[in-house]
A protein has these predicted regions:
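Short amphipathic alpha-helix that is part of the acyltransferase structural core
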Residues: 2-12, 35-46, 118-174, 295-302
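A conserved beta-strand-loop-helix scaffold within acyl/acetyltransferase catalytic domains
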Residues: 17-39, 44-46, 159-217
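Conserved GNAT acetyl-CoA-binding A-motif
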Residues: 61-73, 235-247
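Conserved catalytic-core motifs of GNAT/GCN5-like acyltransferases
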Residues: 72, 87-103, 264-279
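Conserved active-site tyrosine of GNAT-family acetyltransferases
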Residues: 80-81, 257-258, 263
Length: 302
């Protein structure tokens, strides 16, 4: 990347995720390269020619063997990305606090060629029991007997946890700078341990939730449901307005947890994650926690 004036700011090239800046001429942006999941997220600074940007990412996709390039933008910017071959795969309501985010994607063949006609649509979603789309009072979620929970905020510990369980959980960091949750619920019942984490963004009042130890059996559903609920309660105390989660579309039990807690699917993302040697579609679940007004100018100015 150095020949293209891209500056690496992550810890090393052997890491599964790199954050890279690119600046050349009037093009200026940052991107998150996730080699484990064969995708790349663009953080665009809204300057430069979109066709040049697209051509640049097409070259990276071929060089890195990527399946997907995507970006998360406001509505007015989505039109520019659509004009150069990106497809809208869904939205994250309230992602920018007062505006929704559109997920714009470009999917590639095994030969690194962009798939013509845009990202292929995923098949029909699996039937998931629960109350998807309905508001649910989180107070009604009962704590399983014998379950003990603790909130963890130690960055080093959270980094170690992701390093240990992240791959099996299909964890994929979504933000810049820190590639692990900054808060997590650690739950214990007997000899079994569970982790649910969140990447928070106080500027925009949202958080991404991940079950780092996803349910493998029906009997684990009440435990994970309570862990997610406890984390949502804590995020609400931090004035988080909304949360979202990315989940493999065929992980029925994990999808059921979000459904039972009143999340609803707002995006279906083709070949968004990689499991073993297989590209897997993902569902994006969203839930609003509170209607938090945009900060007053006086608070921003101190």
């Amino acid at each position: 990347m150095s020949s293209q004036h891209a500056a690496q700011i992550s810890s090393g090239t052997d890491e599964p995720v790199e954050e890279i800046y690119y600046r050349k001429g009037d093009i200026d942006f940052c991107f998150l390269l996730n080699r484990r999941h064969h995708n790349l997220r663009v953080f665009d600074y809204r300057v430069g020619n979109y066709q040049q940007k697209r051509d640049f990412f097409d070259r990276i996709a071929r060089a890195e063997g990527l399946r997907k390039v995507f970006t998360v933008v406001e509505k007015q910017d989505s039109k520019s990305w659509r004009s150069v071959g990106f497809s809208r795969e869904g939205a994250i309501p309230g992602y920018f606090r007062t505006a929704d985010a559109y997920i714009m994607s470009r999917v590639y063949t095994e030969d690194g060629e962009p798939i013509q006609g845009g990202a292929p649509k995923m098949g029909a979603p699996l039937a998931v029991p629960g109350k998807e789309g309905k508001d649910k009072d989180l107070k009604s979620v009962v704590k399983p007997r014998g379950l003990n929970i603790e909130f963890i905020r130690d960055p080093a510990l959270l980094e170690d946890i992701v390093r240990g369980v992240g791959q099996d959980a299909l964890y994929a960091p979504f933000r810049r700078g820190v590639f692990n949750p900054d808060i997590a619920v650690q739950a214990k019942t007997g000899k079994k341990e569970y982790w649910v984490g969140a990447e928070t963004d106080s500027s925009f009042g949202h958080a991404k939730v991940d079950m780092l130890t996803p349910p493998m059996k029906d009997i684990e559903l009440p435990v994970l449901e309570y862990c997610v609920k406890a984390l949502l309660d804590e995020l609400h105390k931090q004035e988080t307005a909304s949360v979202f989660a990315l989940c493999a579309a065929d992980w029925t039990l994990s999808n059921q947890v979000y459904s039972e807690l009143g999340f609803k699917v707002t995006a279906r993302l083709t070949d968004h994650i990689t499991r073993a040697d297989e590209f897997v579609g993902a569902q994006l679940w969203h839930r609003r926690l509170a209607h938090v007004a945009a900060p007053k100018l006086s608070s921003l100015l101190g």
